[in-house]
Every structure is written in C-alpha cells, then in structure tokens.
C-alpha cells in the first residue's frame, strides 16, 4: 500500500458503510404510474416526499411549489420508465425546486468573470506517462485518500469543496495521513480572487493555500455554509495539523487522456455543467447526459473504471451530501467523444502539487506546537 496504511483503508471503508446507512434513512421516494394519475395522488406523493426529506413548507409556498414538483416527478418517472439511458433518476431533496432556484442555490457559482491564477508549478508532471500503461481502474476511496462526502448547503462554495478533495487526497498519498480539511477557511479567508458563497475558482484556492501557509483542519475551522470573518489565526491555536502544498498544475485542456494520467496518480479538481435536470436528479448508473459545457459547478474526480456493460466512467465526488446520487458520487461517462469530455469534465481540470511530506511551516502558522503535513 505504500505510504497509505491499512488502518487508513479500514477507516475509509467503515466511513463508507456508515455513509450508506445514513443515506438509507432518507431513501428515494418510489414512484409508480398510479402516483401520477391524479392531482390527489400527486399531492399524496408530495406529502410523502416532504416527510422523507424533512421539508416543511407553509401553505401558500406548498401550493406555489406543487406545480414544480409535479413537473419534476413526471420528468423523473418518464426517464426511468423509458429505460433508454444507463442511469436512473430519483426524487431527491431538490424535488420541488425549479431549475432557476436550483442553479442559483447549488450551482452557477464558479466565478467565470475572474481569471484563474496561473499554475505556480509549470508544466504537466504526468505528460510522459503512457496511457496504455495506466491501470484499467482507479479508486482513491479504496486507497484511503478520500474523506466522507460533505454538503455545501445553500452556499455557492463548490469551488472550495472541489479544492479540498484534491488537497486532502494528495496529502494522504504523500504522508499516509487522511485529514479532513476546512472549506470554511477558504470561504472566509481566500477573498482576494474568490468570493465565498458567491463563487470562486479552484486554481485560485490552490494558490491561496500555497501562499498562506497551508490549510487548517475541518475540526478546527468547521463549515457554516455562510461567509464570515476570517479567524484562521484563532482556529490554528486549536489545530494540531496544517496541510501544505507546493502549488498546482493544470491538466492540458480538453484531454481526457491527460485527465486519466493525472487521476491515476491523485484526485483532481474539475468543473462541469451540473444545472440540468438529469444531473440534478441523478440517482445511479453511468451518467451519459444530457448536459452541455457551460461550466457552473466544481467537483473532483477520484477515480475511473468500466461498468458491467462496458461503458467507461469517471468517479466524481460531489458536495450535495450523501443522499444525492450514488452516496454522494456520480459516475460520468468517460471517453464519450464530446469535445472537452461529457459535461465539460476535461475542460478545466487542475490538481495540487505536493512533493514533500513536511515542508517548513510559514511564520503565520507559528502559533504553538502543531504538526505540519
């Protein structure tokens, strides 16, 4: 296993089992033809959905949203009944949201008007790897390099979650220590080029981490789903660990082969178009669209593989909680032939670079005895 210990692997497997159990407590609402046959049946379905997802709507709001719920329920049921795609949808917690609300709340938060920071580490370190020599499948979860699925809530902070997945991953690979890191530090403190819940870019976040002495743990600086005052110095006093990186590199744009080269070696941050209804209500299987390339959501690729039907896929970690998709993940079709990859997954990929396990801490972090990773 190299630097990643068997203890880390067991811990990650236990966490995955617990996550699945938690998801089952909020299972998908089954739908049959009879559930959509009448207004009365649809109202009953809506009430069951609200109960299952612990959603409370006032009378007027409930009636206003019912029309959207009906439309979404028909869309999901029709897709699943046709069975002409290798993936299924379900009536998840977004069930009574229209796409405009969903986009404003959970996606559409990458700052396309702000240029990303150029890579501080030049080149593409995996360029010389022969694609034919790469393993046929990779899953960094099984190697103990991925923490549990998190939930960004109603905050446009996907960029921070995407960044953190990649940094947690390379840190675990280099040090053998899987540490959950703080998205909240990025939201509160990385404000020069990123904008908290209003959006940001992963490349800029990597450079913040490099230039500001690393990233603190989630335990010391927990997530609040809202932007607040940067208090990393105070939080650092209670944190035994801070994780450093050397910078970042970009994967050559629009190349799924180069993305595979990188993912074979570490988790990679990517941007996708995630605002479509099919992505919104994804449940299981290999996602084959529909989606475009208007990049609006930051996620992370933590592996790749081939499904039983022979369809290749990317394993993507999302930040919408473990009740979405396949316990918080989506398998996106790999090598689809689409320019930039399906949903634009290969258009703007990047990853943190970490060559040493314990670099010298910067003075900003010198606030008592702490371990530097």
Swiss-Prot record:
Glycans are attached at residue 130. Keywords: Disulfide bond, Germination, Glycoprotein, Hydrolase, Protease, Signal, Thiol protease, Zymogen. Residues 1-28 form the signal peptide. GO terms for biological process: proteolysis. It comes from the Eukaryota. Orally administered proEP-B2 may be well suited for treatment of celiac sprue; can be expected to remain active during the gastric phase of gluten digestion but be rapidly broken down in the duodenum. Its EC number is 3.4.22.-. The active site is at residues 158, 297, 318. Repressed by leupeptin, a peptidic cysteine, serine and threonine protease inhibitor. Resistant to proteolysis mediated by pepsin and chymotrypsin but degraded by trypsin. Leupeptin binds at residue 158. This is Cysteine proteinase EP-B 2. It comes from Hordeum vulgare.
């Amino acid at each position: 296993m190299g630097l990643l210990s068997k203890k880390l692997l067991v811990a990650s497997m236990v966490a995955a089992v617990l996550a699945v159990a938690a998801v089952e407590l909020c299972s998908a609402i089954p739908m049959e033809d009879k559930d959509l046959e009448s207004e009365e049946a649809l109202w009953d379905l809506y009430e069951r959905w609200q109960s299952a997802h612990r959603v409370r709507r006032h009378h007027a709001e409930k009636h206003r949203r019912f029309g959207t719920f009906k439309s979404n329920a028909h869309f999901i049921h029709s897709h699943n009944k046709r069975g002409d795609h290798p993936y299924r949808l379900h009536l998840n917690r977004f069930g009574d949201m229209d796409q405009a609300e969903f986009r404003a709340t959970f996606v559409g938060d990458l700052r396309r008007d702000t240029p990303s920071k150029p890579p501080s580490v030049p080149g593409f370190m995996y360029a010389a790897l022969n694609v034919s020599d790469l393993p046929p499948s990779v899953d960094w979860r099984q190697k103990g390099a991925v923490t549990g699925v998190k939930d960004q809530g109603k905050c446009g902070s996907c960029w921070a979650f995407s960044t953190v997945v990649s940094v947690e991953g390379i840190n675990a690979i280099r040090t053998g220590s899987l540490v959950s890191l703080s998205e909240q530090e990025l939201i509160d403190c990385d404000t020069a080029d990123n904008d908290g819940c209003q959006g940001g870019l992963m490349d800029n976040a990597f450079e913040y981490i490099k230039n500001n002495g690393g990233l603190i743990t989630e335990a010391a600086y927990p997530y609040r789903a809202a932007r607040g005052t940067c208090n990393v110095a105070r939080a650092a006093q209670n944190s035994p660990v801070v994780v450093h990186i050397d910078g970042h590199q970009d994967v050559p744009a629009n190349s799924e082969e180069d993305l595979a080269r990188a993912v074979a070696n570490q988790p990679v941050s990517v941007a996708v178009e995630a605002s479509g209804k099919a992505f919104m209500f994804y449940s299981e299987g290999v996602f084959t669209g529909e989606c475009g390339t208007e990049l609006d959501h930051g996620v992370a690729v933590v592996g790749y593989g081939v499904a039983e039907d022979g369809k290749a896929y990317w394993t993507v970690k999302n930040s919408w909680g473990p009740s979405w998709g396949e316990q918080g993940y989506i398998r996106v079709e790999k090598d689809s032939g689409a320019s930039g990859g399906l949903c634009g997954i290969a258009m703007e990929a990047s990853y943190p670079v970490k060559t040493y396990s314990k670099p010298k801490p910067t003075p900003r972090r010198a606030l008592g005895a702490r371990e530097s990773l």
